[in-house]
């Protein structure tokens, strides 16, 4: 499996894009990630003006010609979610009206992904609505990373390439030379994700935390299924939001005798009170996330490790542009 652990930052471009029609455009959600992707591809992002009017309306203008180009719009729909999503759709419309040949929305973090089904009557399936809105805005293709559930890929009636942050996380974990590893799913719903992660980690054993959620953002861990005593436990999830699920799981693992505890997630949503929960010195040895969502400075703490997914996204963008396989990146 190709290593995607760090972003390339060298003088020589990785690809020959001298006469290419590939163009990168970054929204305001994660410009640093977009810069790293551009560095990997050896090109520069197309300049963009994005501003807000006094009444809160957004304005976007592409600052150079993209006529006939293969345009990739880089925009995680993270907080502020509604503004990020609306800005992305306005960017798409601007590219469409500027005669771009193809428009791909690169969405490292897909907001509203947790609203992927109805759990009670009279609820919206907002993940499907979001997919519909993106399609109607004029997107030709979507490139997403670690969707909350695989079924969201099927919400789109256009091509949707789904890639995974696990190679980046596993490259880093393997560099730590950990021993007696057990991969732990923080809830029953994440078992498939944890099983796939464990298989990639030299077929490590799997444990599951049986948990019941009494209300939104309130999590209660009950018991551990599997052996964790004396082992290095790696809690794996797609995202860390308030930190309730993963921290309650870690507390239970500690009570059950786990020797070391690492938390891993692709998306650092980090809503309050996640900082207070995750920065506890006696809970996690490390909290490992990717830069799919920018981590604001005042949320950094000693145990936090942020890994770049720029190489992986850049490679996927190049393969889409060249009409070659994306799935083979993960074989």
Swiss-Prot record:
Pfam families recorded: Pribosyl_synth, Pribosyltran_N
Binding site for ATP: 55-57
GO molecular-function terms, A-Z: ATP binding; kinase activity; magnesium ion binding; ribose phosphate diphosphokinase activity
Pathway: Metabolic intermediate biosynthesis; 5-phospho-alpha-D-ribose 1-diphosphate biosynthesis; 5-phospho-alpha-D-ribose 1-diphosphate from D-ribose 5-phosphate (route I): step 1/1
Subcellular compartments: Cytoplasm
Residues bound to Mg(2+) 2: 187
Enzyme Commission number(s) from the entry: 2.7.6.1
GO cellular component: cytoplasm; ribose phosphate diphosphokinase complex
Entry keyword set: ATP-binding, Cytoplasm, Kinase, Magnesium, Metal-binding, Nucleotide biosynthesis, Nucleotide-binding, Transferase
Coarse class of the protein's main subcellular location: cytoplasm
The record's free-text note on cofactor binding: Binds 2 Mg(2+) ions per subunit.
GO biological process: one example: ribonucleoside monophosphate biosynthetic process
Cofactor field: Mg(2+)
Residues reported in the UniProt entry to bind Mg(2+) 1: 148
EC category name: transferase
Active site positions, chain numbering: 211
Residues the record lists as binding D-ribose 5-phosphate: 213, 237, 241-245
SUPFAM superfamilies: PRTase-like (SSF53271)
InterPro entries to which the protein is assigned, alphabetical: PRib_PP_synth_CS (IPR000842), Pribosyltran_N (IPR029099), PRibTrfase_dom (IPR000836), PRTase-like (IPR029057), Rib-P_diPkinase (IPR005946), Rib-P_diPkinase_bac (IPR037515)
Paired cysteines (S-S): none
Catalytic reaction list: D-ribose 5-phosphate + ATP = 5-phospho-alpha-D-ribose 1-diphosphate + AMP + H(+)
Family: Belongs to the ribose-phosphate pyrophosphokinase family. Class I subfamily.
Function: Involved in the biosynthesis of the central metabolite phospho-alpha-D-ribosyl-1-pyrophosphate (PRPP) via the transfer of pyrophosphoryl group from ATP to 1-hydroxyl of ribose-5-phosphate (Rib-5-P).
Subunit structure: Homohexamer.
Name this protein carries in UniProt: Ribose-phosphate pyrophosphokinase
Organism: Prochlorococcus marinus subsp. pastoris (strain CCMP1986 / NIES-2087 / MED4)
């Amino acid at each position: 499996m190709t290593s995607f652990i760090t972003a390339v930052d060298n003088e020589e471009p990785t690809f020959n894009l001298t006469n290419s029609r590939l163009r990168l455009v970054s929204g305001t959600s994660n410009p640093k990630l977009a810069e790293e992707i551009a560095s990997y591809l050896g090109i520069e992002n197309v300049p963009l003006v994005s501003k807000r009017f006094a009444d809160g309306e957004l304005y976007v203008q592409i600052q150079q010609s993209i006529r006939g180009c293969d345009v990739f719009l880089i925009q995680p729909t993270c907080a502020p979610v509604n503004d990020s999503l609306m800005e992305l759709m306005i960017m798409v419309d601007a590219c469409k009206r500027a005669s771009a040949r193809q428009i791909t929305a690169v969405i490292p973090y897909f907001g509203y992904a947790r609203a992927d089904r109805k759990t009670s009557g009279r609820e919206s399936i907002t993940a499907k609505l979001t997919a519909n809105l993106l399609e109607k805005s004029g997107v030709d293709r979507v490139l997403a990373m670690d969707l909350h559930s695989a079924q969201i890929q099927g919400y789109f009636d256009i091509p949707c390439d789904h890639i995974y942050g696990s190679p980046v996380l596993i490259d880093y974990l393997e560099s730590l030379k950990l021993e007696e590893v057990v991969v732990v799913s923080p809830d029953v719903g994440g078992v498939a994700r944890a099983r796939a992660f464990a298989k990639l980690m030299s077929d490590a054993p799997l444990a599951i935390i049986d948990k019941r959620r009494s209300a939104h953002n309130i999590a209660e861990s009950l018991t551990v299924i599997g052996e964790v005593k004396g082992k290095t436990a790696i809690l794996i999830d797609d995202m860390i939001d308030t930190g309730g699920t993963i921290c309650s799981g870690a507390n239970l693992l500690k009570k059950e005798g786990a020797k070391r505890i690492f938390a891993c997630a692709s998306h650092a949503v980090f809503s309050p009170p996640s900082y207070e929960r995750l920065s506890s010195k006696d809970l996690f040895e490390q909290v490992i996330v990717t830069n799919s969502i920018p981590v604001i400075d005042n949320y950094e703490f000693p145990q936090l490790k942020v890994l770049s997914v720029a190489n992986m996204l850049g490679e996927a963008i190049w393969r889409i542009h060249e009409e070659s396989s994306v799935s083979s990146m993960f074989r």
